UniProtKB/Swiss-Prot annotation:
Family designation: Belongs to the H(+)-translocating pyrophosphatase (TC 3.A.10) family. K(+)-stimulated subfamily.
Predominant location: membrane
Name of this protein: Pyrophosphate-energized vacuolar membrane proton pump
Activity modulation: Inhibited by excess pyrophosphate as well as excess Mg(2+). Inhibition by ATP, GTP, and CTP is reversed by increasing the Mg(2+) concentration. This suggests that the substrate is a particular metal complex such as MgPPi(2-). Modification of Asp-283 with DCCD abolishes pyrophosphatase activity.
Binding site for Mg(2+) 4: N534, D691
Species of the source: Vigna radiata var. radiata (Mung bean)
Superkingdom of origin: Eukaryota
Known catalytic reactions: diphosphate + H2O + H(+)(in) = 2 phosphate + 2 H(+)(out)
Complexes and interactors: Homodimer.
Domain notes: Has 16 transmembrane helices and a large cytoplasmic domain that contains the active site.
Chain positions of site Important for proton transport: R242, D287, D294, E301, D731, K742
Keyword Ion transport: yes
UniProt-listed InterPro entries: PPase-energised_H-pump
Length: 766
């Protein structure tokens, strides 16, 4: 067997130190962003003026607006967006807080009742000769870790939103000095969010494990069963963040586009459009706060899944701390690798032209993957015993440390492949999107047909990538292999999030430039940043969906072993009915979220039309629109509409587990995983392709694009219709599906002891 080279003390120092370095790096990047001043006060001395960058660039007065006014205007708009986003999140968190308390009580009652709230120790499920802590302890600690995960998730989302709204106007102002400066500001702000989230998630989990260990001592099984609540808390908050934020952002977006662009023929982000502030707020609450919570949830769950599966392995039974915390050590090294990778974008290379933006972001993915592969090899060598035993459904499996390294590496590279395939299908630099744009010649119908076909086709390679990584990792290390493969895919989360958050920040920067009446040249620069951000956002969604599939499977494995099922037989009717119902759930969920966006957008369209018709001088630009009403419509609609889809996901495992038992529930989990992944990938890519086909026609960068006509042509109108249909697909139902897949699995895992003892009431009666 042989113990790990890295001593336990080394592990206990390494993990928190890496987390603290991550947080320090995030604060340092934030400090650099904050050096861009949003006040228009000039220093008297010429040296100070040079230092503040006033002499770096010529102030463009093409629009007759002097520098002072532009800065003040940008600050005002930024303030409005920040206030809108903060008020939405506080309203959302009020409702989510009530849910958290109610669900925490439920966890305590269900898990406590497993042994009738007894406080005496019980025989362990994996080894009857040993005694484990009572179920009541698991109930209390699971409840605490659920609340911890939930709060960490909410804080992550909120901080991300604050950073994004802090950086958007600064990116706009930097765009006056050139595209390179604006890129660095947007990217640094994204990095602040990425590192804060990754380091926070790791640190809180590590502290929780150490505090719980004081009580649990050597009972790893009980300890990590209780820690699973952390993943459940993180993901259930992410569900409301993603669904609520997604409905908010798309209701505003669709409403603003339909009335502004299609009916009134005014440009995007025109300050005369009443829904324009709501649209920009939506970018922050959906694409930043929602996405941050989502990836944090995946991160927490993949760690929990790996720890639960490992707790009944040989190093779990021999109490080897370093080997046990291998998943956390991988994440710690991930933070250091991402730190190095970020410096490539901000310090080692400079962006001088528009065409260098997208390659720079893609390089981030490649560099982080290559460096991480080396990092994981080192970690596997020092933190694992040369060989160890994993118990898989009652069967022992001997695993070598190099095999576990391959499991992590396979997940890591599968993530990169999924990212690049997504980019190929959604970037307008390649033929798939250009074909979709070309199909607009014959109207919106052919555009929709081509877009749907593209989405379905884009599922093929990612599914093979996921399938191969599952096969390889399962062959080498059973369910533990799959859990660490998911962790491998998420190990470069800090870089992934930085790239992801960069998109909405640039999008907002463009909106602010338009509203502040800045020159055409600046708008072109922010548009170029935004177009690259659009593709990288699609790559980010690919990562989130791919990792969700692996995480869900790992959680499924942990659930099956916790619920003491030895085999899941598809031929038994109990399992098969679960399978069919599970496969239907993603469709039901998508129907709810799509309809919610539609009905919220209807209200928005009516309000925007009402303002254009009743406010005199609005179209001429002499009167100000009532932005606040539109923000309120989006807020109210999204809060009301996020409850039914949320209830569907949270209640399904409970209802199925209690009424039909663990076998049917295992069928439901497998079914939802299989169909959910396919719909999520195709929905995200279809929406992304329609969006970029529209941008391709608008930019008119190539001969082919120019032949499809300028803005306002029939081709362009057909493209706008496709884009509007794709909005809820790519930003609401697609990305929320990966939470459905993971959340049902992690919830089943948390409640597994209860379902195993009290579940299947219907089958007991009949």
């Amino acid at each position: 067997m042989g113990a790990a080279i890295l001593p336990d003390l080394g592990t206990e120092i390494l993990i928190p130190v890496c987390a603290v370095i991550g947080i320090a790096f995030a604060l340092f990047q934030w400090l650099l962003v904050s050096k861009v001043k949003l006040s228009a006060v000039r220093d008297a001395s010429p040296n100070a003026a040079a230092k503040n960058g006033y002499n770096d660039y010529l102030i463009e007065e093409e629009e007759g607006i002097n520098d002072h006014n532009v800065v003040v205007k940008c600050a005002e708009i930024q303030n409005a967006i920040s206030e809108g986003a903060t008020s939405f999140l506080f309203t959302e968190y009020k409702y989510v807080g009530i849910f958290m308390v109610a669900f925490a009580i439920l966890i305590f009652l269900f898990l406590g009742s497993v042994e009738g709230f007894s406080t005496s120790p019980q025989a362990c499920s994996y080894d009857k000769t040993k005694t484990c802590k009572p179920a009541l302890a698991t109930a209390i600690f699971s409840t605490v870790s659920f609340l911890l995960g939930g709060v960490t998730s909410l804080v992550s989302g909120f901080l991300g939103m604050k950073i994004a709204t802090y950086a958007n106007a600064r990116t706009t102002l930097e765009a006056r000095k050139g595209v390179g400066k604006a890129f660095i500001t947007a990217f640094r702000s994204g990095a602040v969010m990425g590192f804060l989230l990754a380091a926070n998630g790791l640190l809180v989990l590590y502290i929780a494990i150490n505090l719980f260990k004081i009580y649990y001592g050597d009972d790893w099984g009980g300890l990590f069963e209780a820690i699973t609540g952390y993943g459940l808390g993180g993901s259930s908050m992410a569900l409301f963040g993603r669904v609520g934020g997604g409905i908010y952002t798309k209701a505003a977006d669709v409403g603003a586009d339909l009335v502004g662009k299609v009916e009134r023929n005014i440009p995007e982000d025109d300050p005369r459009n009443p829904a324009v502030i709501a649209d920009n707020v939506g970018d922050n609450v959906g694409d930043i706060a929602g996405m941050g919570s989502d990836l944090f949830g995946s991160y927490a769950e993949s760690s929990c899944a790996a720890l639960v599966v490992a707790s009944i392995s040989s190093f779990g039974l021999n109490h080897e701390l370093t080997a046990m915390l291998y998943p956390l050590i991988v994440s710690s090294v991930g933070i250091l690798v991402c730190l190095l990778t970020t410096l490539f974008a901000t310090d080692f290379f400079e962006i001088k032209a528009v065409k260098e933006i997208e390659p720079a972001l893609k390089k981030q993915l490649v560099i982080s993957t290559v460096l991480m592969t080396i990092g994981v090899a080192v970690v596997s060598f020092v933190a694992l015993p040369t060989s160890f035993t994993i118990f898989n459904f009652g069967v022992q499996k001997d695993v070598k440390s190099w095999q576990l390294f391959l499991c992590v590496a396979v997940g890591l590279w599968a993530g990169l492949i999924i990212g690049f395939v997504t980019e190929y299908y959604t970037s307008n630099a390649y033929s798939p999107v250009q074909d979709v744009a070309d199909s607009c010649r014959t109207g919106a119908a052919t555009n929709v047909i081509f877009g749907l076909a593209l989405g379905y086709k884009s599922v093929i390679i990612p599914i093979f990538a996921i399938a191969i990584s599952i096969f390889v990792s399962f062959t080498f290390a059973a369910m533990y292999g799959i859990a660490v493969a998911a962790l491998g895919m998420l190990s470069t989360i800090a870089t992934g999030l930085a790239i992801d958050a960069y998109g909405p920040i640039s999008d907002n920067a463009g909106g602010i430039a338009e509203m502040a009446g800045m020159s055409h040249r600046i708008r072109e620069r922010t548009d170029a940043l935004d177009a690259a951000g659009n593709t990288t956002a699609a790559i980010g969604k690919g990562f989130a969906i791919g990792s969700a599939a692996l995480v869900s499977l790992a959680l499924f494995g942990a659930f099956v072993s916790r619920a003491s099922i030895t085999t899941v037989d598809v031929l038994t009717p109990k399992v098969f009915i679960g399978l069919i119902v599970g496969a239907m759930l993603p469709y039901w969920f998508s129907a709810m979220t799509m309809k919610s966006v539609g009905s919220a957008a209807l209200k928005m369209v009516e309000e925007v039309r009402r303002q254009f018709n009743t406010i005199p001088g609005l179209m001429e630009g002499t009167a100000k629109p009532d932005y606040a009403t539109c923000v309120k419509i989006s807020t109210d609609a999204s809060i009301k509409e996020m409850i039914p889809p949320g209830a569907l996901v949270m209640l399904t495992p409970l209802v199925v587990g209690i009424l039909f038992g663990v076998e049917t529930l295992s069928g439901v989990l497998a079914g939802s995983l299989v169909s959910g992944v396919q719909i999520a990938i195709s929905a995200s890519n279809t929406g992304g392709a329609w969006d970029n086909a529209k941008k391709y026609i608008e930019a008119g960068a190539s001969e082919h694009a120019r032949s499809l006509g300028p803005k306002g042509s029939d081709c362009h109108k057909a493209a706008v219709i496709g884009d509007t249909i794709g909005d809820p697909l790519k930003d609401t139902s697609g990305p929320s599906l990966n939470i459905l897949i993971k959340l049902m699995a992690v919830e089943s895992l948390v409640f597994a002891p209860f379902f195993a003892t009290h579940g299947g009431l219907l089958f007991k009666i009949f």
